[in-house]
A protein has these predicted regions:
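A short beta-strand motif characteristic of beta-propeller blades
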Residues: 54-59, 97-104, 150-155
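Short, conserved, GDST-rich strand-edge loop motifs in beta-rich repeat architectures
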Residues: 126-133, 177-197
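Beta-propeller blade signature
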Residues: 137-143, 195-199
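Residue-level detector of Asp-centered blade-edge/turn motifs that repeat once per structural unit
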Residues: 72-73, 118-119, 169-170
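Short loop/turn segments that connect beta-strands within beta-propeller blades
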Residues: 50-52, 93-95, 143-146
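N-terminal export signals
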Residues: 1-25
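Repeated scaffold domains used in trafficking and secretory/extracellular systems
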Residues: 63-69, 109-113, 160-165
């Protein structure tokens, strides 16, 4: 296989998916690789790079991020806070500007993942309820015309410690991976390893 063929095939495999902590975004312009990073001082950043490795933006955020949820049609992405963060960050992918810091309700923390629906009108985030430790919650957020997310509902994840969530190909069925691990908002310490029940 020639180098050019290999690179083209590799690039095709990367398109639209997460590879080694990166996300891909392209919309009638040069593709952008998205990720989150920390510097030597422990500061956290949402970052975008060209395929040639040129940094387009490095937006400082308060909390370490885990996953990136890209809007299906707008140049927006939510950099989701790593468990047990109470913040996630909505970033303009054309400028790198922080548009909004999403904050969970007082009795919740993010579990690291979120997805937009196919039309990009609603966002679903995995969360933990700290009032009822271990109760998994899916936060529902509505994207308004000003491109801000507003909390509109809570759904049960039907398990403990929801982590990843994805749409099935029908676009109507949301699948949630409950890790079964109970943690509290103050640390990442697992509190129930002897009795965890993933689902």
């Amino acid at each position: 296989m020639q180098r050019r063929t290999f690179l083209a095939a590799s690039l095709a495999a990367v398109a639209g998916s997460a590879v080694l902590g990166w996300r891909w975004w392209s919309q009638e312009r040069q593709p952008v690789l998205l990720s989150a990073r920390d510097n030597a001082q422990g500061e956290h950043f949402a970052v975008g790079y060209t395929l040639a490795g040129e940094q387009l933006f490095a937006t400082q955020v308060t909390a370490r991020c885990h996953d990136i949820c890209v809007h299906p049609s707008l140049p927006l992405a939510l950099f989701t806070g790593r468990r047990p963060s109470t913040e996630s960050y909505l970033i303009d992918l054309q400028t790198g500007r922080l548009l909004q810091t999403l904050v969970t309700p007082a009795n919740r923390h993010f579990q690291g993942h979120a997805v937009f629906d196919a039309r990009g009108e609603r966002l679903y985030s995995t969360e933990n309820d700290t009032d009822e430790p271990g109760r998994g919650v899916i936060g529902v957020w509505q994207l308004d015309t000003a491109q801000r997310l507003q909390r509109v509902d809570d759904l049960s994840s039907h398990g403990v410690g929801p982590h990843q969530l994805l749409w099935l190909p029908d676009g109507k069925t949301l699948v949630v991976a409950n890790g079964g691990i109970r943690t509290e908002s103050g640390s990442r310490e697992a509190l129930n390893l002897d009795a965890m029940e993933p689902s």
